[in-house]
Regions:
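Asp-based, Mg2+/Mn2+-dependent phosphohydrolase catalytic module
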Residues: 2-4, 113-114, 120-211
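Short amphipathic alpha-helical segments and helix-helix/interface helices
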Residues: 24, 94-98, 154, 178
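Proline-centered loop/turn at the N-terminus of a beta-strand
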Residues: 105-107, 187
């Protein structure tokens, strides 16, 4: 195993804590009952990830979601619930990222739409941090028009940064993304969603910042 020089982090479920199940359950207030959730499970899951990734116009996705809600529901009502996907951002992780940048190149690679990202940037600012302080570069699906786990998004990030996959440690909480990164040559860590601190690899790189 080569010495680590670069760190690549997913955002949702890795840097920020997100409770996807509570978002789906919150849709009950808009008429998406338990029965509907069971019947339309695949569709609801697809629409949520489609909204997050930002490769389909948000208005198109929201309109499709609206068809599952009770009459009188507006897209604004849905957006208010989907804002919960911005999640809870532990300031301790942001503090750690700043320290990690003193020793490593640190990049963010996330499937996220423009609305959620701008709200996330605002949340970081409220906690006293800018993306420039936290990351050497940010790579987002909605801006790149590519999404994980497609090899193209890893290729473009590598070309733009000049990073060496063999010396890159990659953290992602979705198995297909972690595997795609591994196939690309990264040293991948499949993160237990919202529990980054439990992983030995995270603990080890943070120990290195104290040496």
């Amino acid at each position: 195993m080569k010495q680590i020089e670069t760190l690549v982090f997913d955002y949702g479920g890795v840097i920020v804590n997100i409770d996807y199940a509570s978002v789906v359950k919150a849709m009950e207030s808009l008429g998406v009952t338990m029965f509907k959730r069971l019947i339309h499970f695949r569709k609801i899951k697809r629409l949520i990830y489609q909204y997050i990734n930002g490769l389909v116009a948000e208005a198109v996705t929201l309109k499709e979601m609206l068809s599952l809600c009770r009459e009188g529901t507006s897209t604004e009502d849905i957006e208010e619930i989907l804002e919960e996907l911005c999640g809870n951002l532990p300031v301790e992780r942001l503090e750690a990222l700043v320290k990690l940048r003193k020793r490593y190149k640190v990049y963010l690679l996330s499937n996220i739409n423009n609305t959620l990202w701008q709200k996330s940037v605002s949340l970081m600012k409220q906690l006293g941090y800018s993306t420039d302080e936290l990351f050497d570069g940010v790579f987002l699906s909605y801006a790149m028009r590519k999404e994980k786990p497609s090899v193209e998004i890893y290729e473009e990030m590598t070309q733009m940064t000049g990073l060496d996959p063999a010396t890159t440690l990659y953290f992602d909480d979705r198995a297909e993304n972690a595997q795609a990164g591994r196939n690309f040559g990264f040293q991948s860590v499949l993160v237990k969603t919202n529990h980054l601190e439990e992983h030995q690899e995270w603990q080890d790189i943070n120990k290195n910042t104290k040496e």
